[in-house]
Amino acid sequence: MPTIQQLVRKGRQDKVSKNKTPALKGSPQRRGVCTRVYTTTPKKPNSALRKVARVRLSSGVEVTAYIPGVGHNLQEHSIVLVRGGRVKDLPGVRYKIIRGTLDTQGVKNRKQARSRYGAKKEKS
């Protein structure tokens, strides 16, 4: 516990919070070009083939981004919009691709949580 005199001399030091999405450079989203689209396996105890893409962002940084939803139309040179948000069972994946914008199509036949997957309302 510091004395008042020590606080007068030095003061309290601010806690430095770590940026979780440094490649976005403070923006909510960034546009990028897919350099590689592939699948990876998650950490234990999960088992799957998770769809991910290597994306070169407009900020010049290359990141690994997760492609959410069932099925996708992405390939090399596709232009995508990337947001922050990690995938817990994929180490090093700290970004997600936004569905339904630019070259990324929305998820087909999606009934619930449509806005997250860029799916339009079905005409009934």
Curated annotation (Swiss-Prot):
Source domain of life: Bacteria
Residues with 3-methylthioaspartic acid modification: 89
The UniProt record lists the keyword Zinc: no
Keyword RNA-binding tagged: yes
Any Gene Ontology biological process: translation
Pfam families referenced in this protein's UniProt entry, alphabetically: Ribosom_S12_S23
GO molecular function: rRNA binding; structural constituent of ribosome; tRNA binding
Gene3D superfamilies: Nucleic acid-binding proteins
Keywords: Methylation, Ribonucleoprotein, Ribosomal protein, RNA-binding, rRNA-binding, tRNA-binding
Regions that span the bilayer: none
A single GO cellular-component term on record: small ribosomal subunit
Stretch list, region Disordered: 1-32
Family note: Belongs to the universal ribosomal protein uS12 family.
Subunit and interaction comment: Part of the 30S ribosomal subunit. Contacts proteins S8 and S17. May interact with IF1 in the 30S initiation complex.
Listed HAMAP family: Ribosomal_uS12_B
Purpose of the protein: With S4 and S5 plays an important role in translational accuracy. Interacts with and stabilizes bases of the 16S rRNA that are involved in tRNA selection in the A site and with the mRNA backbone. Located at the interface of the 30S and 50S subunits, it traverses the body of the 30S subunit contacting proteins on the other side and probably holding the rRNA structure together. The combined cluster of proteins S8, S12 and S17 appears to hold together the shoulder and platform of the 30S subunit.
Name of protein: Small ribosomal subunit protein uS12
Organism annotation: Nocardioides sp. (strain ATCC BAA-499 / JS614)
Gene that specifies this protein: rpsL
